[in-house]
């Protein structure tokens, strides 16, 4: 019986040590200029906006939220191409539904079909996972975006910007996900 236990124990040890990870030799998909090149379609678009105003009350600046909005894209027929020479093009249409919630009054909902043509240059900073778009035509993609997810099939971007105009501040958070063709 002791020999049987010993053989079973040895068999178990051999079984465990002989198993290997099938993915051990697989190289990860690195964020690089070569790997990001390709044609993509939009899979998701979300834009959140907060509009605040500041007013001076007895020398103290008081912020006041004027309105918030949430915009969600849908029904995408949109091609986005990143070329190896650092240029990009984006064209097509999609439906965008926007819900604006003012500080006072009723919520306003709007749905429209947007047609976009956009082109320009891009610069990839793979070390910091950022991509910057400079548009020469259109303004669908403009500025620096954080790369949240990048793999063989998906590119997800996020941009948070703040626009000041006098006492009004617009905080805009844009998230876009693309699927590689």
Predicted regions and their residues:
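C-terminal motif of bacterial Sec signal peptides marking the signal peptidase cleavage site
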Residues: 14-18
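Hydrophobic helical h-region of N-terminal Sec-dependent signal peptides
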Residues: 6-13
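Positively charged n-region of N-terminal signal peptides that target proteins for export
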Residues: 1-6, 21
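Lipid interaction determinants
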Residues: 20-181
